[in-house]
From Swiss-Prot:
Species annotation: Neisseria gonorrhoeae (strain ATCC 700825 / FA 1090)
Role summary: One of the primary rRNA binding proteins, it binds directly to 16S rRNA where it nucleates assembly of the head domain of the 30S subunit. Is located at the subunit interface close to the decoding center, probably blocks exit of the E-site tRNA.
Subunit structure of this chain's protein: Part of the 30S ribosomal subunit. Contacts proteins S9 and S11.
Protein name per its UniProtKB record: Small ribosomal subunit protein uS7
InterPro entries referenced in this protein's UniProt entry, alphabetically: Ribosomal_uS7, Ribosomal_uS7_bac/org-type, Ribosomal_uS7_CS, Ribosomal_uS7_dom, Ribosomal_uS7_dom_sf
UniProt xrefs under CDD domains: uS7_Bacteria
HAMAP family, per database record: Ribosomal_uS7_B
Lineage, broadest ranks: Bacteria, Pseudomonadati, Pseudomonadota, Betaproteobacteria, Neisseriales
Length: 156
């Protein structure tokens, strides 16, 4: 634990186009080397593609995709008597959002489309409809937690 005072959390401003704090957070997750304008261009381009492809409001598809990707439980390693156990723990809300955004970003980067905005649009549409790489990752994490349910009494 640091001995200095606790650093206050910075407030994230909502994005100018949609007024969504989650969208700004996602841009920050997507950003590489501090190039926020590039991240903004990718996200807004992807949202335009989503509106073209689905005909639904892009921000709704985005919110649905993130909500579907949020994990409920995950496993953490805990050492007990010389053995490491994968202990299932509930994920706190702020971490749920962060993990979901990270998984959507990583799944989009692995896709085969030509540009990042097309990849991101495809992944967001897939995640909102209950499929895609981000949901595969979530299911994998849930499976791990389910498999190690027996160790849940080793809580943190």
């Amino acid at each position: 634990m640091p001995r200095r005072r606790e650093v206050p959390k910075r407030d994230v401003l909502p994005d100018p186009k949609f007024g969504s704090v989650e969208l700004t957070k996602f841009m920050n997750v997507l950003m590489i080397d501090g190039k926020k304008s590039v991240a903004e261009r990718i996200v807004y381009g992807a949202l335009e593609q989503i509106e073209k492809k689905t005909g639904k409001a892009a921000i709704e598809v985005f919110n649905e995709a993130i909500a579907n990707s949020k994990p409920i439980v995950e496993v953490k390693s805990r050492r007990v008597g010389g053995a490491n156990y994968q202990v299932p723990v509930e994920v706190r809300p702020s971490r749920r959002l962060a993990l979901a955004m990270r998984w959507v970003r990583d799944a989009a980067r692995k896709r085969g489309e030509k540009s990042m905005d097309l990849r991101l649009a495809g992944e967001l549409i897939d995640a909102s409809e209950g499929r895609g790489g981000a949901l595969k990752k979530r299911e994998e994490v849930h499976r791990m937690a389910e498999a190690n349910k027996a160790f849940s009494h080793f809580r943190f």
